[in-house]
Structures are given as C-alpha cells and as structure tokens.
Amino acid sequence: LTASAFASFSLSMIISRFTADALMDRFGAAKVVFYGGVVGGAIWSASILIAVPLSQTASQTNNLLALVLINIGFFAAGAGIVPMFPAFIVGAAKVPGIPASLGIARISVISIAGYFLGPTVTGLISELTNLPTAFMYPGLALIVAGIAGRGLRDK
C-alpha cells in the first residue's frame, strides 16, 4: 500500500504531461506554473500534515483515510510539477539580451543541481527530524517554484 503514493504521483505526471501544453496554450505558462506549484505544493504539504497523525492511530478507518489523503497529496504534487520544466526552458529561451542556448543551459544546470541537492537535503532533514517533516521541504520548494514562475513571459 505504501507504493500507492508513488503510483499516484506517477499517474498524475503522465496525465498532466498530456494536458499541460493545452493548459499553457489556453491560460499561459505563468498562470499554469504558478497555480500548479502553489496549489500542488499546498495540497501535498497539507496532506502530509493531516495524514501522518491520522495514520498513527489504531483505527483502521483513520489509516484508510490517511492513505487516501496521502495519495491525493502526491497526485496534486505530480500535477503541479509537470508543466514547470518545459515552461522554464521556454522562458529561459526568451530572456532579452541572453542567447536562447545560454538561457536553456542555465536552466539545465539548475535542474541537475536540484536533482542532486533535493534528495540530499530531504535526507538530511529526515536524519535530523523525521520523514514527514522532511517531505515538507519538497512541498515548500514546489510552492517557491510556482511563485518564481510568475516571472514567465507568455508572449
């Protein structure tokens, strides 16, 4: 059952990958990234804050509710993450005064750094506190990335 959160996250990313381009065409990349990041990060964080205490009770009903809430949180996080990288790549290519190749290279370096630093920081926080607290860090990072996405230019 614990793998269901990863399955929800992955399924959400697949669905969102097929719909994100249409949403960005209709509403603009800045709005999609902002709302995806802020709402996805907030739901993910809230699901952890609510579900973890619920799961620590002896009640089967509470454990099932906690499982459903965690899956909703991971699903929301997956949907919020997907449009970010393509939108930031396109945005980096449109920065005035910077060649598109340089902007894209910078975003790629930031992405690779996040790939290595994100899990490392999450693990460090987990060692210092506990795993539910550590999972608040990526939720916060998703919210920050969503806010940073407000600077994207749609035209």
Feature roles, as predicted:
Residues 1-9, 102-106:
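Loop-to-transmembrane helix entry
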Residues 2, 32, 103, 125, ...:
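Alpha-helical transmembrane segments of multi-pass secondary-active solute transporters
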Residues 10-18, 115-116:
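Residue-level signature of mid-helix packing/kink "hotspots" within the transmembrane helices
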Residues 16-29, 126:
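Helix-to-loop junctions at the C-terminal end of transmembrane segments
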Residues 18-22, 120, 147:
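Residue-level hotspots within transmembrane alpha-helices of multi-pass secondary transporters
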Residues 30-88:
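C-terminal transmembrane helical hairpin of 12-TM major facilitator-type secondary transporters
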Residues 96-131:
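A late C-terminal transmembrane helix in Major Facilitator Superfamily
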Residues 139-155:
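Multi-pass alpha-helical transporter architecture, strongest
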